[in-house]
């Protein structure tokens, strides 16, 4: 068996997508070298997903020892990075370093089809899958022969997370006081009376129920004992409370909500009704979260009602209030809102695929989707002008701020919505103008002592412990083994093994930062521990000087405070070092706990009067790539096993906690490990919400899509749709920064897109 050598860098042409494959020299089908390996390419960064894939590869090798083994190839840059990597390898006719399987969105099939490199999965049994979630194969551009080319294995949707305590402060500040109480605003030596004039429609049952949840969230956030007014641990119970519980009585916990409001006020500032388009005279209903038009209007009113911290603050530090509404996926929000405004009809959307061809003329020739996009944009424009919108840039998800009360609500993927909640004792690293929650799999870098650094090349070291893959909770620490990894300047000395017990630091700015931190007289004394379940930092004496932090979590690398330093042996992700950071431990009242968040579907209509509700359906599919006759057969053999064959899986893994799931297919194991929904027919016909405890909110929405109660939206698949999506996101992000109007936004979008999209 010949193993392919390392991947080589390929330069990409700078031409438009419609010409790249022809101009760069690649047009037409080509065979790959048969190297006896099935290469599966993915850009997934979720560690649970990666661990599940490795377990699946091992299981397949055990069960099919005579078959080609599967190897994982991790491509950086997310789905777009993998998509671009595939196009580049197609353009070079890379028969030595290409893939057999790709986990990505179906537009990759269209890209493969430009060189006839798509692999029809005609030997894969898809009977277990719901036909409703396979039908997108009919909307893939460039494919001549009808069939199954992409199989969805991990579905998610978009969810809205409301920060209950923050919403309570906003609404409680704005609403009319039932007992005639007034808000007193003190200015100088005199007081003026400021009345809240907003109403909460308590005659509407949905609104009444939502307000109750918001009140309960605020009470949980500011929970105190009966004799104390300062926030206490939220699991604390006083002797009086125990006595009242025994007697069947209860205590008035309205003070808890007031404590929460007082604390959140420090971040959000004073509520004010003067000015235009505030909450003055407004009637709040739960329906504001059901459609984009009302949601954006409400968000704008909130921003204008807190001018000192939002409307009048165009520039914000990472530790300050970021706005009212956070959006993780700009394309998802714009596309689903515009699709809903068009009645859930692809013929009225930006682009569609018919007879194997993608058509973008509806938007570019200013048809109905152009008008709908203008309506949606102008709703956003009001919020942008009031500095109330936060959008994800460079991996800085809104959940990073929602969990610290720096946003009121946000929309993001159901697969990651749990990141909106902080841990029991949340820690945050603050550096420069940025702040991040203390990442998982993070360790403290300690300065070397004089005796350690005899030759002057040792920069520092960190110690981590392994728990042999067992869950941390309930495990005997004696079973753990620790290892110390040292960081050296420029190169690793003899006697040390790079990647195993040493790392060479070559970035001069990072070297200087670590050396300067070691010289600093200030000694950092945070608690030394990792936040992951399987790895722990060995606790050291508090006198050890912390000069930085090293993590394998996904970080935005700026080469100023954050640096990529390569991969340690055994790690699936590269290590990153954070320097010049301050570690802060936050009181729970300053964080959003899971019981204080309110989970809702993303807005499913543009306006409440729209006849059709729409839900986003997203997630990667398993896609085959042509190689050669033998590898094509082996590829389909693996995919068929992955989809259909039930196996027994490790009981201590996330996908099979305590063995409770019994036998299941590799696809089921992967979905459960990753927090996705697998669209088998039985998922929606024989299973209940209780069987989807970690994905029940997404499950309910996807079940409604499967049952025809909602129209599912997913991008039509054309090889140009990836660039189209990236371009509209870039143009919108620019409009947020510059506060451009629609005409300027759209003109910039057209210029970046190019003429090739007008050709049909």
UniProtKB/Swiss-Prot annotation:
Biased composition (Polar residues): 222-257, 448-472
Lipid-bearing positions (N-palmitoyl cysteine): 24
Signal peptide range in chain numbering: 1-23
Location(s) in or outside the cell: Cell membrane
Any one Gene Ontology cellular component term annotated for this protein: plasma membrane
InterPro entries noted in UniProt: Lipoprotein_10_C (IPR004890), Mycoplasma_lipoprotein_cen_dom (IPR004984), P68-like (IPR054825)
Pfam families to which the protein is assigned, alphabetical: Lipoprotein_10, Lipoprotein_X
Topological relation to the membrane, as annotated: Lipid-anchor
Positions of region (Disordered): 220-262, 443-482
Lipid modification (S-diacylglycerol cysteine), residues: 24
UniProt entry keywords in alphabetical sequence: Cell membrane, Lipoprotein, Membrane, Palmitate, Signal
Family per similarity comment: Belongs to the MG185/MG260 family.
Protein's name in the database: Uncharacterized lipoprotein MPN_408
Organism: Mycoplasma pneumoniae (strain ATCC 29342 / M129 / Subtype 1) (Mycoplasmoides pneumoniae)
């Amino acid at each position: 068996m010949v193993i392919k050598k390392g991947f080589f860098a390929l330069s990409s042409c700078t031409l438009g997508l419609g010409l790249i494959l022809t101009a760069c020299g690649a047009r037409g089908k080509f065979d790959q070298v048969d190297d006896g390996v099935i290469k599966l390419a993915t850009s997934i960064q979720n560690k649970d997903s990666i661990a599940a894939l490795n377990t699946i590869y091992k299981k397949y090798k055990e069960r099919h020892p005579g078959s080609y083994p599967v190897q994982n190839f991790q491509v950086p840059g997310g789905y777009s990075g993998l998509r671009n990597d595939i196009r580049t390898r197609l353009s070079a006719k890379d028969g030595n370093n290409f893939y057999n399987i790709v986990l990505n969105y179906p537009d990759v099939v269209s890209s493969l089809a430009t060189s006839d490199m798509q692999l029809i999965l005609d030997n894969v049994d898809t009977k277990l899958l719901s036909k409703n979630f396979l039908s997108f194969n009919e909307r893939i551009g460039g494919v001549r022969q009808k069939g199954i080319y992409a199989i969805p294995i991990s579905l998610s949707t978009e969810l809205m997370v409301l920060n209950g305590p923050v919403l309570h402060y906003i609404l409680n500040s704005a609403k009319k006081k039932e007992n005639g109480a007034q808000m007193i605003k003190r200015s100088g030596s005199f007081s003026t009376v400021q009345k809240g004039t907003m109403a909460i429609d308590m005659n509407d049952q949905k609104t009444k129920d939502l307000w109750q949840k918001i009140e309960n969230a605020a009470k949980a956030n500011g929970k105190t004992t009966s004799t104390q007014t300062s926030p206490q641990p939220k699991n604390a119970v006083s002797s009086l409370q125990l006595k009242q519980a025994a007697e069947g009585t209860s205590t008035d916990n309205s003070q808890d909500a007031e404590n929460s409001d007082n604390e959140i006020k420090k971040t959000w500032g004073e509520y004010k009704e003067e000015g235009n388009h505030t909450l003055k005279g407004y009637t709040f209903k739960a329906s504001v979260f059901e459609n984009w038009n009302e949601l954006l209007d409400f968000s704008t009113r909130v921003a204008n009602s807190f001018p000192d911290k939002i409307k009048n603050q165009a520039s914000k530090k990472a530790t300050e209030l970021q706005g009212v509404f956070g959006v993780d996926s700009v394309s998802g929000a714009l596309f689903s809102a515009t699709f809903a405004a068009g009645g859930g009809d692809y013929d009225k959307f930006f682009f569609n695929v018919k007879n194997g061809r993608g058509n973008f003329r509806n938007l570019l020739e200013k048809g109905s989707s152009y008008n709908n996009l203008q309506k949606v944009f102008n709703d956003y424009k009001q919020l942008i002008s009031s500095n109330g919108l936060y959008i994800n840039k460079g991996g800085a998800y809104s959940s990073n701020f929602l969990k610290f009360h720096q946003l009121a609500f946000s929309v993001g993927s159901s697969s990651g919505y749990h990141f909106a909640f902080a841990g029991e004792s949340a820690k945050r690293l603050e550096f420069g103008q940025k702040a991040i929650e203390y990442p998982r799999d993070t360790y403290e870098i300690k300065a070397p002592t004089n005796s350690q650094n005899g030759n002057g090349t040792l920069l520092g070291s960190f110690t981590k412990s392994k728990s042999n893959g067992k869950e941390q909770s309930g495990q005997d620490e004696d079973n753990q083994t620790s290892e110390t990894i040292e960081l050296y300047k420029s190169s690793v000395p003899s006697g040390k093994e790079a990647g195993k017990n040493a790392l060479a630091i070559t970035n001069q700015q990072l070297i200087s930062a670590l050396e300067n931190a070691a010289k600093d007289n200030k000694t950092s004394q945070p608690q030394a521990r990792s936040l992951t379940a399987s790895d722990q930092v060995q606790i050291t004496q508090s006198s050890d000087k912390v000069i930085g932090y090293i993590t394998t979590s996904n970080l935005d690398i700026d080469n100023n405070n954050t640096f990529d330093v390569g991969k340690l042996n055994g790690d699936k992700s590269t290590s990153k070092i954070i320097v010049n950071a301050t570690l802060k431990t936050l009181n729970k009242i300053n964080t959003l706990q899971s019981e204080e968040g309110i989970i809702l579907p993303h807005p499913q209509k543009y306006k409440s009067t729209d006849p059709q509700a729409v839900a986003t359906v997203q997630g990667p599919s398993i896609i085959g790539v042509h190689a050669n006759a033998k590898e094509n057969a082996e590829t389909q053999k693996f995919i068929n096993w992955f989809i259909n064959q039930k196996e027994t899986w490790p009981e201590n893994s996330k996908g099979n906690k305590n063995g409770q799931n019994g036998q299941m297919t590799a696809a089921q194991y992967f979905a459960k490990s990753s927090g996705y929904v697998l669209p088998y027919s039985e998922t929606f016909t024989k299973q209940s919400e209780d069987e989807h405890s970690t994905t029940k909110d997404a499950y309910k929405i996807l079940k409604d899509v499967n049952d025809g109660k909602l129209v599912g939206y997913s991008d039509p698949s054309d090889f140009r749709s990836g660039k189209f999506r990236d371009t509209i996101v870039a143009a919108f992000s620019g409009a947020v920064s510059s506060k451009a109007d629609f005409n300027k936004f759209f003109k910039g979008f057209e210029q970046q897109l190019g003429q090739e999209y007008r050709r049909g």
